């Protein structure tokens, strides 16, 4: 069967479909947390922080449900990749929670340059999550995965370039009040930037499943 028109038909039973649906749910949770984090960076509203923490806790439960359904599913050769995908998506929620909690500790707001760079990273990250959702479409319904994987990898490389060549170089020369203020700032940015690595890793795990079906 032509790869481009290939349909996998492996996720039609309840347990298999539940795994995919819960992976999608983790993606939607991450997208929601990103929007909340952006709002929190503008307001430091404690209610928003609590909502981000609550979403992370719900993500833990969703990840547990995925593991349970994987044990019941009939795809033993794909369990590792799907379980790892769930763990990585759960890590994105952890990173967003930690980023919000670190931002709470910062005494100073970001200057315009740094805020714009972080907004750019978050915008590209949102786009990567949307592409990851398209990967699940192909895994579930069939299609050509390679162009979507390439887009995700290109966007991850772009975020790496922004971090290495713009944010990191800027931070080196940034004056901060204390060592701890600087560490909190760097840890915040690391949590934001690392999300793109998690997304790329999920895409790689799902790509393995796709290749198994060829």
From Swiss-Prot:
Pfam families: PhoU_div
InterPro entries per UniProt: DUF47, PhoU-like_sf, Put_Phosphate_transp_reg
Domain of life: Archaea
Entries under PANTHER family matching the protein: UPF0111 PROTEIN HI_1603 (PTHR36536:SF3)
Family the entry assigns: Belongs to the UPF0111 family.
Protein name: UPF0111 protein MJ0629
Lineage: Archaea, Methanobacteriati, Methanobacteriota, Methanomada group, Methanococci
């Amino acid at each position: 069967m032509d790869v481009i028109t290939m349909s996998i038909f492996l996720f039609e039973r309840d347990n298999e479909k539940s795994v995919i649906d819960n992976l999608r749910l983790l993606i939607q949770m991450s997208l929601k947390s990103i929007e909340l984090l952006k709002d929190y960076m503008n307001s430091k509203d404690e209610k928003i922080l609590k909502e981000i923490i609550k979403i992370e806790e719900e993500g833990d439960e969703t990840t547990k449900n995925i593991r349970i359904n994987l044990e019941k599913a009939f795809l033993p050769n794909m369990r590792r990749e799907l379980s790892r995908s769930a763990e990585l998506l759960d890590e994105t929620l952890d990173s967003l929670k930690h980023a919000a909690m670190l931002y709470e500790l910062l005494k100073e707001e970001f200057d315009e340059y740094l805020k714009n760079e972080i907004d750019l990273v978050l915008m590209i990250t949102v786009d990567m999550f949307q592409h990851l959702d398209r990967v699940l479409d192909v895994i579930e319904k069939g299609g050509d995965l390679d162009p979507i994987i390439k887009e995700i990898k290109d966007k991850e490389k772009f975020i790496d370039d922004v971090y290495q060549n713009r944010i990191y170089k800027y931070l080196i020369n940034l004056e901060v009040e204390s060592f701890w203020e600087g560490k909190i700032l760097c840890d915040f940015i690391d949590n934001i930037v690392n999300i793109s690595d998690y997304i790329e890793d999920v895409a790689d795990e799902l790509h393995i499943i796709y290749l198994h079906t060829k």
